[in-house]
Amino acid sequence: MTDDQFFLESESERCSQEDSLFHILPVPYEKTVSYGTGTAGGPAAIIASSQQLEAFDGISLPLESGIYTHKAVDCSGNDTEVLAEIEKKTASIFAMGKIPVILGGEHTVSYAPIMAAKKHFDVVGVVHFDAHADLRDELDGSKLSHACVMRRVHEDRKSTRLNSSH
């Protein structure tokens, strides 16, 4: 993927931020993986493979609502800085009345957009599909590990409903 490639480029013209309901935010984050590497390549691979998709899914044309692809988040900083940047960018998408679509990286990526949603909405529901619950308090000395992300999300039970399937 190049910096100027966008989601479903093969099926549409580039949409403006203002005219797009859906905002793709690529987050090539890979800091706490414990088994294999490669999660940082996920967003680029998804965007590149989207060129093989058809815009019509048999029911609707999501492109009619507009899809805007942001430049990938710079994930070279420390965990706290990167997550703050992801949360800030997600919050700005919510503030525009748009729907963020976050393409990650490892599971830790989920934390920041969920925090942005919790600040924007009264109650947030999270449906978590994974082979693991990701509810550890910490892993390898990090409370922001991919294995801890759902625990961090669920700590504020007043505003988060978490359903997990693993």
Indicate residue ranges for each PLM-predicted region:
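Conserved alpha-helical scaffold segments that buttress catalytic/binding sites
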Residues: 2-164
